[in-house]
Design a protein with these regions (language model features):
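Active-site palm subdomain of RNA-directed nucleic acid polymerases
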Residues: 184-196, 586-609
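Conserved catalytic core of nucleic-acid polymerases
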Residues: 257-260, 427-597, 639, 643-653
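Conserved "right-hand" nucleotidyltransferase catalytic core of DNA-directed polymerases
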Residues: 1-13, 24-27, 31-34, 42-43, ...
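Conserved RNase H-like, two-metal-ion catalytic cores of nucleic-acid enzymes
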Residues: 1-110, 118, 344, 400
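A common structural junction motif
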Residues: 627-635
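Conserved catalytic palm subdomain of right-hand nucleotidyl-transferase polymerases, strongest
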Residues: 2-3, 74, 95-98, 378-394
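Short, conserved charged micro-motifs
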Residues: 616-623
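A short acidic-Thr-Gly-centered motif at the start of a beta-strand
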Residues: 1, 61-65, 369-385, 592-596
């Protein structure tokens, strides 16, 4: 049964997410459109919840609650969550299939309109473009005016013609979703992926606890402190708006400090100058403090948390559609500040007590402290502690495994420091972290992080944030790393050649460790060792007049612009996608193993999982780490290791 609903809530869906959205006292379902797959597309039924046909409603509810009937929706998490709240009955994800996730697995846009257009659906099957205005009118509160009689909500009787359009729009969404599903049905989703999505939905439904009293204190103090800093900057500079770059640059020039651009990096550079005038130093320090946008994550926590102080829906399944990794939603847990404070627990204790004066004295400007405390706002359930376990250097391990770089695999098997071992292979001398040739370890580290996916000098610069390696040595480091890793270099070439071959000859090309390239209906597929496939939609070779070479291009969502369009790829990039996809599949198997032991995974970030564990369960860390390090049947010879720790709040060990 295909389902689409239209809803009302005074809570902003985009800001708060669906779980807080349905907790609004005025939340309601307005329209329900549904169809059974044997009805034919002209037979979509629409229930107007203001004037519902009892027989139709009974038919819908009976099917909805029948575990034998599979329900489909585009972004099924929304329909599941709303219908569960509305009917006060559970909506097990095992009974649902998400058409949006299906689209994402094929590299298509994750929105109904975008997916329909990318698939070239005919106009009568596309999403109705009038929808946004109708949602604004009926599904959100309206501003009270004299004209509308000071009402705060539009009902069907306020504009019957618009209401009829809304019903048509709701019906059309089912038509579009069903047509997308029909078009994509030839591409089979592995059952293991459906099971993983169900686990993901249970995890999002359960959520993670937040220390809301602490978050409230931080937001309240930070608002006040930002105002104080703003006023101090105005007083020091005499500027009306010290946030204005143009005004600030003029003022800096008047102080004898020329800065062509005022960015995070240029300010850091300027603050290193011992001769910088004190007044300028203070103004730049204030600007840096005011630029700490990470504090906004606390405000999101306040908007998005549920009544039980849990945050739900923070992970999007298959959100990174090149690799299939999860993406962060609401509070972006994938880009949190590192923990560098000398005593994180003390800083957190001071925040919980609201003693920000002592915090400032001990740790400096609070904006910087707050950015490091974001992780600590996530707390275990009552009577529990967190066990955090992550894969140690998972991408380096997977890359070496698929390439067959034996010396790297052996180093991991023996538990050696991979940065020291890499530097040793590059420079042909022993390298120890705190001993012989230790100065070379940094070169090894930056090279491991920068060079694995065909990265050159540019990638080295991005990874060497501290500028530890002189610029004139960067190319030599790249060359040394490539010389030490011939199997990885060969893998880049093999992947690019495999992609070109399947595009031109429409045949399967197999590489080692179960990786295979194929070409179906104009799309490039890469089969992974797990059996899952990566998809590059509408892949072809395209001549670039700038270099006279044919490049591999496909249609995809641009990571910067978020627009659907042509994207180029090459050997190293394909290797990156494959490596990260295999790392994701390793995490997925470990999550399923941990869940099978009865443990409650509350969230996961990159390659680590955070598990809510009862305090009396003293063996949990050992058992969870063992799950992470256990061999995977489809990856024989891949050395995995789980590193973990226990903590009373989330943190980076």
């Amino acid at each position: 049964m295909g389902v689409d609903i239209e809803t009302y809530s005074s809570v902003d869906l985009a800001e708060a997410g669906v779980y807080a959205y349905v907790e609004a006292p005025d939340f309601d379902i307005l329209l329900i459109s549904y169809i059974f797959d044997d009805w034919g597309e002209d037979n979509v039924k629409t229930i107007d919840c203001f004037d519902a046909d009892p027989d139709m409603m009974a038919e819908f509810c009976e099917a909805l609650l029948d575990p034998q009937i599979v329900k489909t929706a585009f972004n099924a998490n929304f329909e599941r969550t709303c219908l569960a709240k509305w009917l006060q009955k559970p909506m097990p994800p095992e009974e649902w299939r998400c058409t949006m996730v299906k689209a994402l697995t094929l590299g298509l846009p994750g929105n109904l309109a975008g997916a329909g257009e990318a698939l070239g659906l005919p106009p009568e099957k596309l999403k109705d473009p009038q929808g946004k205005a109708l949602i604004q009118f009926f599904s959100k509160p309206c501003k009270p005016t004299r004209t509308n009689g000071q009402r705060t909500r539009n009902l069907p009787q306020h504009d019957p013609a618009k209401w009829q359009l809304y019903k048509s729009y709701n019906r059309q969404d089912v038509v579009t979703e069903q047509e997308i599903l029909r078009k994509l049905s030839i591409y089979k989703t592995p059952e293991s992926e459906q099971e993983l999505w169900a686990l993901d939905q249970h995890m999002n439904d359960n959520g993670v606890a937040l220390d809301i009293p602490m978050v409230e204190k931080i937001v309240e103090y930070d608002t006040r402190r930002r105002q104080e800093l703003q006023e101090e900057a105005q007083e020091l500079t005499g500027l009306k708006n010290p946030n204005s770059l143009a005004q600030l640059k003029r003022w800096l020039a008047e102080q004898g400090v020329e800065m062509t651009s005022v960015t995070k990096d240029t300010i850091t550079e300027a603050l290193r100058d011992p001769d910088l005038p004190d007044i300028v130093r203070r103004v730049l320090e204030i600007r840096t403090a005011l630029g700490k946008t990470s504090v906004a994550k606390y405000s999101t926590m306040l908007v998005a948390h549920c009544q039980d102080h849990r945050l739900r829906g923070i992970l999007q399944f298959y959100g990174a559609n090149r690799s299939g990794r999860w993406a962060g939603r609401l509070v972006q847990t994938h880009n949190l500040a590192k923990n560098t404070l000398p005593d994180l627990a003390l800083a957190r204790e001071l925040a919980a007590e609201g003693d920000f004066e002592t915090m400032g004295t001990l740790f400096g400007e609070t904006a910087f402290v707050f950015s490091e405390l974001i992780r600590t706002a996530f707390i275990p359930s009552e009577g529990c502690r967190f066990v955090v376990s992550d894969f140690s250097a998972i991408e380096a391990r997977v890359l070496a495994w698929i390439a067959g770089e034996e010396w790297t695999l052996e180093a991991f098997r023996q538990g050696k420091d991979i940065y020291c071992e890499t530097a040793s292979m590059m420079y042909h001398v022993p390298v120890e972290k705190h001993g012989a040739n230790s100065h070379l370890r940094q070169k090894g580290k930056v090279a491991v992080l920068a060079c694995g996916y065909q990265g050159g000098v540019g990638a080295m610069k991005r990874m060497d944030k501290g500028g530890a390696i002189p610029e004139d040595e960067l190319q030599s480091v790249v060359d040394q790393w490539r010389g030490a890793n011939p199997s990885v270099v060969k893998l880049w070439r093999n992947c690019e050649m495999a992609a070109r071959t399947v595009i031109e000859e429409h045949r399967t090309v197999r590489l080692k460790n179960g990786i295979a390239f194929g070409y179906i209906n104009g799309n490039l597929f890469i089969k992974l060792p797990s059996g899952r496939k990566l998809c590059y939609w509408n892949t072809h070779l395209k001549m670039d007049p700038r270099d006279g070479r044919e490049h591999i291009v496909y249609m995809g969502v641009n990571q910067e612009t978020k627009q659907w369009g042509e994207t180029e790829t090459y050997g190293g990039k394909l290797v990156e996608n494959i490596t990260q996809a295999i790392a994701r599949d390793c995490l997925a198997i470990s999550m399923q193993r941990v869940a099978a032991l009865g443990y409650n995974i509350v969230m996961h970030v990159h390659d680590e999982m955070i598990v809510d564990v009862p305090i009396e369960d003293t063996d949990a860390l050992e058992r969870i780490n063992a799950c992470m390090g256990e061999a995977i049947p489809w990856a024989p010879g891949l050395p995995l290791r789980g590193d973990g720790y226990e903590t009373p709040f989330y943190m980076k060990d």
